[in-house]
A protein has these predicted regions:
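Bacterial N-terminal signal peptides
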Residues: 9-18
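Soluble metallo-hydrolase cores and metallopeptidase-like ectodomains found primarily
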Residues: 99-101, 114-150, 232-337, 353, ...
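Metal-dependent peptidase/peptidase-like ectodomains
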Residues: 107-111, 124, 149, 155, ...
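His/Asp/Glu-rich mid-to-C-terminal helical/loop segments that flank catalytic regions of hydrolases
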Residues: 346, 353, 357, 467, ...
Length: 547
């Protein structure tokens, strides 16, 4: 134990020396700085930037030291804002069994199912819980939709389809057509199952509506699972959360008289009502190792001159997934997260440098949040317990996973059609003959899958731009190919690594555009708002009333 502590101290001392020496030789060019920050943050030395690890500590130290080098002010007395977390690791002795009238099938973890618990206890058990199919598992009064109406699922296991009904039909009158709503997110489905009193919630993975392959599920939800520390130890969550492959579910359903395709069809019927898959039960024993840790959001401010209590916010998440426990010694085990999200952190560090060199009327805040990969928890904690009045944030700009595409003719707005920030972006792009490209993949629900949503649902206007897809060299076809290859081959895997051949001109382009917009906002009296009819506008209006 003492040897391990000494090693850790020496490791962190070496980190400090490394950070100090490197920061003294920062490049004079944007491209050079971006390459340095991305390559460093995604290097093996940072161990995949998992919270609660030495690599995570190195990441936090690196970002805070960079803020310090730019003479930015901390919030209160420290750049580090506490985010108390729990880490729950499933032990190998845990199991999940699906049974049909006495015939047991012990599921193969990783290949067939992935499961965990967010209840911070050493041991949890479910015995012979009846399995109920609840369609999309949605209660949405505004869409006149309630999958749980008329059914009692207390103590039972619910099987849930991913995404929402609009995706399956493409009909705009059904939810938002192919564009995913928040009701399509896995986070919502687990939350709603808990509100309904279910003991277990299993989401069916199908690649197209999920927007990622099964490998992402394997890498994201196996190993230590992080959550915010809760006074009730997570008692308000279901006991078991998990995913099951669509093909695996289909095999299990053979005994019940249903198949996966028939369930999907039934779930779309206007008269759909949740129903038990008679004879099918779930049993599970969950053995956990529970550890409590203090993670951190890293925040810095460049104070404004005349309106220092009004803020322009730049955000990016610093965490990634760490290492794969199951990797063989000869295999690469580090999920470096170069695109996701060393690129985003590099972007806000570049904004920090630029704004450190100018004076603005309003303050500029730079926020690197933790626990994004665990469900946007760091940004949620900041927004729930804000160190500043969120109503005084003029606008937020989120950077998350910028692909190295090179120069583009466009900038993609994820969640297009939301706020007046898009008008500012369109005007700025038009000056150089470029254009705004609406989200080409609205069915993937990216707008609800990044940290800006923690601020949006509290009324703060945010812009989430995903670079561009219409490449100067190669057009849209080349841009979409880069996105598809990354999503399938690298996202949430060991292949997400920095390459010196990356063309970062597209990221540089984006930073230039957003800097111009944000600098104008920082020296104006403008208060951009959500468009009329947007779900967040009334929240913003109420928060600004009387100010």
């Amino acid at each position: 134990m003492k040897i391990n502590k000494i090693y850790s101290l020496l490791f962190l001392l070496g980190i400090s020396i490394f950070i100090t020496s490197c920061s003294d030789s920062l490049s004079d060019t944007t491209d050079g700085r971006l390459r340095y920050w991305i390559s460093t943050l995604s290097s093996d030395e940072f161990e995949g930037r998992a919270p609660g690890t030495e690599g995570g500590q190195l990441t936090k130290n690196f970002i805070s030291k960079t803020f310090q080098d730019f003479n930015l002010d901390p919030i209160d007395d420290s750049y580090f804002l506490d985010v108390p977390a729990s880490e729950i690791t499933l032990k190998d002795s845990s199991y999940l069994t699906l049974s049909f009238r006495g015939n047991d099938r012990k599921m193969i973890t990783g290949d067939e199912v992935v499961f965990w618990t967010k209840q911070a206890r050493d041991y949890r058990k479910i015995r012979d819980s009846d399995v109920v199919f609840v369609g999309y598992g949605i209660v949405a009064p505004e869409y006149n939709w309630n999958d749980y109406e008329g059914v009692d699922v207390k103590g039972k296991t619910v099987v849930i389809l991913i995404n929402d009904p609009g995706f399956a039909t493409g009909k705009l009158r059904l939810f938002n057509g192919r564009s995913m709503t928040y009701y399509g997110r896995w986070t919502y489905k687990f939350e709603e199952a808990a509100r309904q009193g279910a003991a277990a919630a299993i989401i069916v993975h199908e690649e197209e509506p999920a927007a990622y392959p099964w490998s992402v599920v394997e890498n994201s939800w196996q190993g230590p699972q992080l959550d915010l520390q809760r006074d009730d130890l997570g008692a308000d969550r279901v006991i078991l959360e998990g995913w099951i492959r669509d093909s695996t579910l289909n095999d299990v359903l053979n005994f019940t008289g249903f198949n996966y395709d028939s369930l999907k069809e039934i779930a779309l019927e206007k008269t759909f009502s949740a129903f038990p898959l008679r004879g099918l039960t779930l049993s599970s024993e969950i053995h956990n190792k529970v550890r409590y840790l203090q993670s951190h959001n890293i925040a810095a401010v460049k104070k404004g001159i005349s309106n220092p209590d009004e803020y322009i916010l730049f955000m990016a998440h610093w965490d990634h997934l760490g290492e794969i426990d199951s990797a063989q010694p000869s295999e690469d085990s580090i999920m470096n997260g170069a695109v996701d999200n060393a690129t985003g952190v590099a972007a806000i560090l570049e904004f920090a440098k630029r704004f450190s060199e100018v004076e603005t009327d309003r303050s500029i805040m730079f926020l690197a949040v933790t626990l994004e990969e665990s469900g946007l928890l760091g940004s949620e904690y900041f927004a729930k317990y804000p160190p500043i009045d969120l109503a005084n944030i003029v606008a937020g700009f989120n950077y998350d996973g910028i692909l190295p595409t090179g120069l583009t003719n466009d900038m993609v707005v994820v969640g297009y059609g939301a706020s007046e920030l898009e008008d500012l972006l369109e005007n700025e792009l038009a000056r150089s003959g470029r254009y705004v490209n609406p989200d080409p993949n609205p069915e993937k629900g990216y707008f609800y899958r990044s940290d800006h949503i923690s601020f949006a649902k509290r009324g703060v206007p945010v812009l989430y731009s995903d670079g561009g897809f219409d490449l100067v060299a190669g057009g849209k076809e080349a841009g979409f190919l880069i996105e598809e290859e990354y999503r399938v081959d690298a996202y949430h895997g060991v292949a997400d690594e920095y390459d010196e051949s990356w063309d970062l001109e597209g990221l540089n382009q984006s930073i230039d555009v957003i800097f111009n917009i944000s600098n104008d906002l920082a020296n104006s009296q403008q208060w951009p708002n959500w468009y009329d009819g947007n779900e967040f506008k009334s929240i913003r209006d109420a928060s600004r009333e009387g100010k």
